[in-house]
């Protein structure tokens, strides 16, 4: 996976920093704890973007551009529950495509569906995520779609921490993935703007490289 830097990468990181969707804590005693149990100096809450029309539109247009470049033959846009659902809705509206969403697991009531929406087996889908950390939940969502007979062209997220274990999970599952922006761009801009210095930058690089 080549983590490219372009203007869209930078614009989205700037927007996430402006609305405090990304928070950095270089003091190890104050690090965040992810749901996976990983201790982290960074927390990215892309759900906040829903509350900012200009930013969510910019993100949706970024998704559409990437989908058109990578997967122009897509049939359905699929959001992951819950944070990927609104972005999938905005994307599918712009592209005039059907939308589905996929849960982390099947319901234990009603029709016990894991995938919601009407679909035909054999159709091509792109999965929309707000965030890729370890890649586990994204891969499980994509595999659930494959098990129902859908062809997963790839997973696209707003942001990735660029963790090696995420790349390994996607490679093992043979599922392509890409993002609108990523951890490397975040560190570059944080340093440029004085949000972090050389010492803090190295702490953040070492944390990522050691996972």
UniProtKB/Swiss-Prot annotation:
Q: Which Pfam families match?
A: Pribosyltran (PF00156)
Return one GO MF term.
orotate phosphoribosyltransferase activity
Catalytic reactions on record: orotidine 5'-phosphate + diphosphate = orotate + 5-phospho-alpha-D-ribose 1-diphosphate
Q: In which pathway does it act?
A: Pyrimidine metabolism; UMP biosynthesis via de novo pathway; UMP from orotate: step 1/2
List the EC numbers from the record: 2.4.2.10
For this UniProt record, the keywords arranged alphabetically read as follows: Glycosyltransferase, Magnesium, Pyrimidine biosynthesis, Transferase
Cofactor(s), by name: Mg(2+)
> Record-annotated residues binding orotate?
133
Purpose: Catalyzes the transfer of a ribosyl phosphate group from 5-phosphoribose 1-diphosphate to orotate, leading to the formation of orotidine monophosphate (OMP).
Quaternary context: Homodimer.
Q: Which family does it belong to?
A: Belongs to the purine/pyrimidine phosphoribosyltransferase family. PyrE subfamily.
What protein does this entry describe? Orotate phosphoribosyltransferase
């Amino acid at each position: 996976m080549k983590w490219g830097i372009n203007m869209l990468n930078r614009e989205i990181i700037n927007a996430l920093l402006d609305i405090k969707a990304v928070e950095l804590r270089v003091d190890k005693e104050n690090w965040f704890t992810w749901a996976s149990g990983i201790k982290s100096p960074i927390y990215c809450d892309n759900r906040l973007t829903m509350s900012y029309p200009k930013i969510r539109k910019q993100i949706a247009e970024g998704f559409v551009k990437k989908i058109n470049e990578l997967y122009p033959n897509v049939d359905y846009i699929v959001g992951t529950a819950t944070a990927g659902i609104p972005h999938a809705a905005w994307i599918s509206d712009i592209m005039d495509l059907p939308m589905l969403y996929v849960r982390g697991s099947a319901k234990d009531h009603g029709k016990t569906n894991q995938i919601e929406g009407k679909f035909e087996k054999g159709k091509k889908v792109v999965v929309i995520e707000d965030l890729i950390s370890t890649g586990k939940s994204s891969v499980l969502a994509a595999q659930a779609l494959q098990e129902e007979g859908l062809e997963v062209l790839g997973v696209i997220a707003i942001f990735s921490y660029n963790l090696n274990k995420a790349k390994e999970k996607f490679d093992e599952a043979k599922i392509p993935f890409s993002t609108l922006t990523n951890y490397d761009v975040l560190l570059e801009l944080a340093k440029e703007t004085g949000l972090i210095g050389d010492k803090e930058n190295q702490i953040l690089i070492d944390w990522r490289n050691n996972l």
